[in-house]
């Protein structure tokens, strides 16, 4: 049985993914003051899950215990990444929060680097993130430590999300793992 996602050209899926992530993030950020970070994340993930379940129609049976543990960990990392990031926004300017959050995936990239050129690319990415953010114009003493801790946690969950996304992709065909997460 083919899913709706199987019949859509890949570039269109990528474009739809980009639009949905950006729109969902913007909408969720505007909801944070009204329903809190937790409520915003729950609504965002429930909506995304419903769409994925409809369009991907994943198989629920026939997966190993290891596959289920992987997809559950992936979903938890995704939820906690979003929750800690949105929570950090109550304490930090968005540019600073994003800059701190990027420490997670950049640290992962640095840890997985095998060549000096990889390390140069990680350093260039880190410099670029800092330069386009508000991080350099915001004195460290003015930053709330709670916000810093939450943004660092969001970065750690982002790194875990990256690792678990790869493992989930190895355990489930196509988008099934993401839909089940």
Locate predicted features.
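Glycine-/small-residue-enriched transmembrane alpha-helix faces in small-molecule transporters
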Residues: 1-39, 76, 80-84, 127, ...
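Specific alpha-helical transmembrane segments that line the substrate/conduction pathway
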Residues: 39-50, 78, 86-116, 154
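Hydrophobic transmembrane alpha-helices of multi-pass small-molecule transport proteins
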Residues: 73, 103, 117-136
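Membrane-interface interhelical linkers
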Residues: 1-17, 49-73, 114-120, 139-143, ...
């Amino acid at each position: 049985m083919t899913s709706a996602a199987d019949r859509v050209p890949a570039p269109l899926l990528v474009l739809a993914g980009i639009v949905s992530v950006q729109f969902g993030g913007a909408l969720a950020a505007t909801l944070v003051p009204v329903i809190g970070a937790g409520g915003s994340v729950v609504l965002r993930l429930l909506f995304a899950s419903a769409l994925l379940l409809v369009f991907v129609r994943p198989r629920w049976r026939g997966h190993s215990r290891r596959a289920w543990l992987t997809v559950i960990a992936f979903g938890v990392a995704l939820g906690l990444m979003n929750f800690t990031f949105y929570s950090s926004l109550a304490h930090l300017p968005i540019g600073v929060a994003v800059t701190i959050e990027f420490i997670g995936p950049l640290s992962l990239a640095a840890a997985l680097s095998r060549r000096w050129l990889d390390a140069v690319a990680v350093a260039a990415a880190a410099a670029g993130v800092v330069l386009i953010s508000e991080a350099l114009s915001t004195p460290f003493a003015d930053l709330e430590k709670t916000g810093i801790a939450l943004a660092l946690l969001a970065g750690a969950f982002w790194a875990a999300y990256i690792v678990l996304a790869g493992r989930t992709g190895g355990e489930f065909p196509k988008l099934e793992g993401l839909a089940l997460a």
